[in-house]
Amino acid sequence: MGAQFHMDPDTYLEEIRADIPRYDELQERTIDAIPFAPGRILELGVGTGETTRRLLERYPDAEVIGLDSQPGMVFRAREMGIEVRLARMEDPLPDGPWDLVLSVLSVHHLQADGKQDLFRRVREQSRALVLGDVVVADVRVAELEKGVDFPDRAVDVAAWCDGGVVWEADDLAVIRATYE
């Protein structure tokens, strides 16, 4: 299991952009990797709602439900009108089926066995999975927090979710899996 991760919703975007200079590119590449126009989307680690906002710009008819383990982030996302539930990725997923399960910068907080368990549960309930996250790479850009961040190699994460790496730069990757 990953450790509990805490960020201030008021300063999150500023801090994440300072820590991850390619944050906005990662967001765009993740959304570009969605293989079809999804109807029902489950977002893991919704945070302040930035990814959901971008998703709904691209897919305005989609229904997005978000999960986050931080009450402050849940509150902030709800202020944006997003349906968000307070839950950890280790908890049972809300009832599917989901057209798409999507996560940006959240899954790396799980250790390898937690990632594999999550991907098994996602496969059972969704048509596709798209992840944009920090991975182990030769070049380290993002600062990692010991006991909180557990990145793995992109090829390993892709294998665990039966997917493939569709974009990789520095220590970031977008991974897509389809289960149709």
Give short role names for the model-derived ranges.
Residues 106:
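Hydrophobic adenine-recognition pocket in adenosine-nucleotide-binding enzymes
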Residues 110-121:
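A short, conserved alpha-helix within the catalytic core of class I
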Residues 21-37:
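Conserved alpha-helix/loop element of class I SAM-dependent methyltransferases that forms part
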Residues 44, 48-91:
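Class I SAM-dependent methyltransferase SAM/SAH-binding core
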Residues 131-175:
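C-terminal alpha-helical "lid/dimerization" subdomain adjacent to the S-adenosyl-L-methionine
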Residues 6-24:
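Class I SAM-dependent methyltransferase Rossmann-like catalytic core
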Residues 102:
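A conserved beta-strand element that flanks and buttresses the S-adenosyl-L-methionine
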